[in-house]
Amino acid sequence: MNSIKEIKEFINTNGNSEGCLENFIDEHYEEFEEIDFNYVETLETDERRWYIISTVVYEVYKNNMLLGYLAINEVTTLKSESSSYSDLFVDVEAYEVKKIVKESFEIIK
């Protein structure tokens, strides 16, 4: 996989109830061997009774070269010690995102 689009499509095609990105990568290790995901920020969260789903933005690197950014909709918190990700039937979903940099100014007195 050499582009954000390829990675996004692979995740969305194969994201069958692993629940979180880490489990998904473990399940598909060979495909993600050269890919690194670095946490950037959490965009939103949806709190459920037994778990929390968040949309998390990651920088995506291949061989230390930035490919771009992906937002991953995934389970970020299990509230019950007796639950596992496979109990939830939550698919990992990926979205392309772009970084927006805001610039502001402050008066110096």
Where are these regions (language model features)?
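Negatively charged, low-complexity tracts enriched in Asp/Glu with abundant Ser/Thr
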Residues: 4-38
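Short, low-complexity interaction segments enriched in Ser/Thr/Pro/Gly
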Residues: 5, 60, 95-99
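Generic marker of "main functional regions" within proteins
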Residues: 17, 21, 68, 79-82, ...
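Acidic, low-complexity, intrinsically disordered interaction modules
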Residues: 33-90
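Acidic, proline/glycine-rich low-complexity IDRs
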Residues: 79-109
